[in-house]
Amino acid sequence: MMISKKYTLWALNPLLLTMMAPAVAQQTDDETFVVSANRSNRTVAEMAQTTWVIENAELEQQIQGGKELKDALAQLIPGLDVSSRSRTNYGMNVRGRPLVVLVDGVRLNSSRTDSRQLDSIDPFNMHHIEVIFGATSLYGGGSTGGLINIVTKKGQPETMMEFEAGTKSGFSSSKDHDERIAGAVSGGNEHISGRLSVAYQKFGGWFDGNGDATLLDNTQTGLQYSDRLDIMGTGTLNIDESRQLQLITQYYKSQGDDDYGLNLGKGFSAIRGTSTPFVSNGLNSDRIPGTDGHLISLQYSDSAFLGQELVGQVYYRDESLRFYPFPTVNANKQVTAFSSSQQDTDQYGMKLTLNSKPMDGWQITWGLDADHERFTSNQMFFDLAQASASGGLNNKKIYTTGRYPSYDITNLAAFLQSGYDINNLFTLNGGVRYQYTENKIDDFIGYAQQRQIGAGKATSADAFWRLSRLRHFLFNAGLLMHITEPQQAWLNFSQGLELPDPGKYYGRGIYGAAVNGHLPLTKSVNVSDSKLEGVKVDSYELGWRFTGNNLRTQIAAYYSISDKSVVANKDLTISVVDDKRRIYGVEGAVDYLIPDTDWSTGVNFNVLKTESKVNGTWQKYDVKTASPSKATAYIGWAPDPWSLRVQSTTSFDVSDAQGYKVDGYTTVDLLGSYQLPVGTLSFSIENLFDRDYTTVWGQRAPLYYSPGYGPASLYDYKGRGRTFGLNYSVLF
């Protein structure tokens, strides 16, 4: 985190973020703005909850220095787990539990647990990022660990142009290089303004600390040999002094190269363990992994609506996720099918928030949320003989089936939040959210039975469908102590809700032997036998923060507990099981600007433990889910026009009661920049000491997929070795 020589607080509602961003951007570089990730119009100093803000300068230093977004956030946010170094942010928990990601108040998490929210926007379009930790009942399901709200750049009244170009390489191969280029133009007047941007990035091959090519992730899909395009437009219309309209539109595409793939050896020998998988060219597949998405949001705000502040937002977003071809393997380690899934989500919704102050010292925030989501998916099967002969590179479609049940989800919610200043020292906060969820599952034939029909081994099968309704009340309460103007302490309780993936939950059925070509359904997951339940999390927090001229620190002890868990089955479906689980830890950050020098230093950390209750005794939790502790540190030196920063990230060991272990590792980076007469030249050396290591996801993946889907070596995903980056950026 950066520290400036001025202390400024900005009050901001997340639904007002897009409206206020231009005003924030006009502040001088030596001012620190702090925003609230709460739906009430409060500053961080008025919040009884841990909140972090990643400012534009901090984010640009990391991104222009060559860091991928997930790596940059893990470096800057104390409670966020280290990056998977893949396309996905799967397993990147906040305080050991799932997170929600929003862009300008629009939720990117869908009911499906595909974790590509951080593969949904290019960092070039980000102005700043705010993070709120702990369960957040004001944002509905999924936010049991916390949320990340990405605030995008907006147009200014004056004409401005941005340009950025960069490259990155480890010089291990002619294919070992990434390139990026981005540009934007913005302008207008005091009544109307806008911004249009285009950002493109091309990833080449990646190599580990030993100079060997890292494996493509065929489970969550990787970024090697892929392209990313982000086109975004925003517009702001100031109707009068109190009313404003703002429009945000985006097209995003991140897709793998259509020439490079994971070679599994002739006859899929790597799956049997008789050869080593490797990345090679020659891919010829009818389905390429990637992410496509569209976003449009229209927001209306009125700061003088019947004596209240009103913000209304309507939005639409869609995404199409395609996965890498993956084998189906029998007990004899023979590949019986080779296929790839595509999962599509369409979502629209609205948010209405009103803030009022009925009397001095009393604030009320209330509102309504509504959204609807449609999910469909399919599985494309490839000619097995051709795929086998080519090691999984020549993939020609032969038929397509459904992958998970299609479904519609409707959410309706009402919330009320209030804050009352008891006196000059204490503020009491509290609120409630009521949420109604309806899941309607379409008729669905079991996935394995669809394969039999597609392969001609059966002609028909029974289908099943489901309709379920969920109702939840979620509460929060907090007490804030204003010790001094720059210093606060707080005690907080909040509830969050994790909603299981309906497709994976209901997509199971037991069928009998075919009768005249028809497969009869004998048993399935149904509402009466196994009602879909949410996992409610109770979260407690005791914290303290201090923001001074040279020192900024925030520390919190936290504890969360739940009595159910979502667990993955061997067939990649899920179940909700009784499982009393608790997570507790201490998280914090200290940043210090050494007076009368150009030096600064800082550290952030998250030390936690995850346990489940087994036969009345608390035991270490499964390492497939339990988050490791983490610490980062930096030393900065910024004599004008230079800026240099050495930083480290450490993920610590974590083990479970079954004896499994995820090994920790430390990486060190050097980031720097030089201010030219026109523009800025940034440079970096990532993984400075060329550390050879397996990522956290690379150690977890074998526990999910091996030996059932091949040897552990097939899922040994390494981190990238030493890489050098160079970037030029200019704003004029």
Curated annotation (Swiss-Prot):
Enumerate the Gene3D superfamilies for this protein: TonB-dependent receptor, beta-barrel domain, TonB-dependent receptor, plug domain
- Please list the residue ranges annotated as the TBDR plug domain: 43-153
What membrane topology is annotated for this entry?
Multi-pass membrane protein
Which is an annotated GO molecular function term of this record?
Answer: signaling receptor activity
What's one GO BP annotation on this UniProt entry?
Answer: aerobactin transport
Location(s), subcellular: Cell outer membrane
Function, please? Answer: Receptor for cloacin DF13/aerobactin.
What family is reported?
Answer: Belongs to the TonB-dependent receptor family.
Q: What is this protein called?
A: Ferric aerobactin receptor
Species name for this entry? Escherichia coli
What is the name of the gene encoding this protein?
iutA
